[in-house]
Structures are given as C-alpha cells and as structure tokens.
From Swiss-Prot:
Enzyme class: hydrolase
Any one annotated GO CC term: cytosol
Molecular function terms from GO: cytokinin riboside 5'-monophosphate phosphoribohydrolase activity
Source species, domain of life: Eukaryota
Protein name (record): Probable cytokinin riboside 5'-monophosphate phosphoribohydrolase LOG4
Record PANTHER family: CYTOKININ RIBOSIDE 5'-MONOPHOSPHATE PHOSPHORIBOHYDROLASE LOG4-RELATED, LOG FAMILY PROTEIN YJL055W
InterPro entries: LOG, LOG_fam
Lineage: Eukaryota, Viridiplantae, Streptophyta, Embryophyta, Tracheophyta
Residues given in the record as substrate binding sites: E91, R109, K110, G126, Y127, G128, T129, I130, E131, E132
Family of the protein in this entry: Belongs to the LOG family.
UniProt source species: Oryza sativa subsp. japonica (Rice)
Length: 230
C-alpha cells in the first residue's frame, strides 16, 4: 500500500464516524446529450447548499463539473477543485471557482479528493468518472477508507454498469456483500439522505451499534464498508 493510500486511511476516521460535511463529486467534463444530466448536476449542487455541505471535485470548469461547482460556490459553500497540471489547458477555461489545488497526476488527484471528502457521489460521466468511481469502491472493499459511496443513476445511465456488477457476483468475481457497498438513487435528495444514513450505520458498526435506526440499504452499505478483503 502506497503513501497516498495511507493518507486516505488517516482521514477516513472522520468520514465513517462523524457527520458528513464534504462531498466528493465525480462527474463528466462534458454535459452529455440529455438535458436531464445537466438538471441533475444543478439539483445536486442546490441540495449540497441546502444541506450546508461543501464540495471537493475534479477542478474542471466545464460540463457537469462546472455546473455543480458553480452552483455550490454561488450558494456560499466551500469548493475545492483538484486538478492535475497536465489537464489545466483542457479542463479549465476562464475563472476557477473557490479553492484550486494543482497536483502532479491522476493518482494524486484521487487521493487528494478522497482525503478531503466524507462521502462520494458519482454523476454520469465518461471513462475518467467511471474509473474514479470504481477505484473508490475498490478502496472501500479493501478497507482503505470507510466513507459511503453513492451512485446518482440519472435516467438509468449506470444500469449497464450495475448489470456488470451483478454478472461479477454471478460468476464469482465479486463477493455478494461487496455488491451493496454503495447506495443508489435517481435523484440527489434521496441519494444524500441515503449517504447520511450509511455514514450513521458505519459509525454504529464501528462503535458496536446495530444500525436499527437506518434503512436496510444503508445498513448493507455499512456492512460492506466494514468488511475488508485480502
């Protein structure tokens, strides 16, 4: 395990055992073809502001990243954008919003975002978004962090990925408990509520509680977060 992973572990105690204060959002540097994707990004930003949550994200000024970050920043919440130096010309145009941190590479970007986050949300996006989502799920499965992960499945965007996960369980490559290591919703309000419940369930699991006050999906996610893989 490398030094960046160690940093995530060190900060992980805040994510699983305390209130969710900062959300890391993975999403596309493009807006996609459907208006519903942009609408979901704007709604997520508004929900973060209403719930007094801060944002850490990939630092881009365009696409869904730009919509979420501008909404959160304009709403008076703290925004931290983390971007590799090589991507500055491609993903940043015009004025950056909030605090910007330039890092060396993609690996440092993910570790830095994870270090500052208490929970994670993936909106629709391309290869980069999917890679970030899968790595943060893998880190949870391996016990590198104990922070809840949420998938905002706008218009069924991630349905095929979810089917692939089911296939992995069916063929014996993914443990059945790990299939429920994240929470899922098709709207931001419901997903943020589930993430908060998953964080509470994870805290109860760590402290020896039974998690009875949260719903079954959150408890399943907490159980997945608690279990470590070899």
């Amino acid at each position: 395990m490398d030094a960046n992973h160690d940093k995530v572990v060190e900060s992980g105690s805040r994510g699983g055992r305390g209130p969710v204060r900062t959300i890391c959002v993975f999403c596309g540097s493009r807006r996609g073809n459907r208006p519903s994707f942009s609408a979901a990004a704007l709604d997520l930003g508004k929900q973060l502001v209403e719930r007094e949550l801060d944002l850490v994200y990939g630092g881009g000024s365009g696409g869904l990243m730009g919509l979420v970050s501008k909404t959160v920043h304009d709403g008076g919440r703290h925004v931290l954008g983390v971007i590799p130096s090589a991507l500055l010309p491609e993903e940043v145009s015009g004025e950056t919003l909030g605090e910007a941190k330039v890092v060396r590479d993609m690996h440092e970007r993910k570790s830095e975002m994870a270090k500052h986050a208490d929970a994670f949300i993936a909106l629709p996006g391309g290869y980069g978004t999917i890679e970030e989502l899968l790595e943060i799920i893998a880190w949870a499965q391996l016990g590198i962090h104990n922070k809840p992960v949420g998938l905002l499945n706008v218009d069924g965007y991630y349905n095929n990925l979810l089917s692939l996960f089911d296939k992995g369980v069916e063929e014996g490559f993914i443990d059945a408990a790990a299939r429920n290591i994240f929470v899922l919703a098709d709207n931001a309000g419901e997903l943020l509520t589930k993430l908060t419940e998953a964080a509470a369930a994870a805290a109860a699991a760590v402290e020896g509680g039974d998690g009875d006050q949260v719903d079954g999906e959150a408890t399943a996610a907490a159980a997945g977060l608690k279990r470590k893989r070899s």
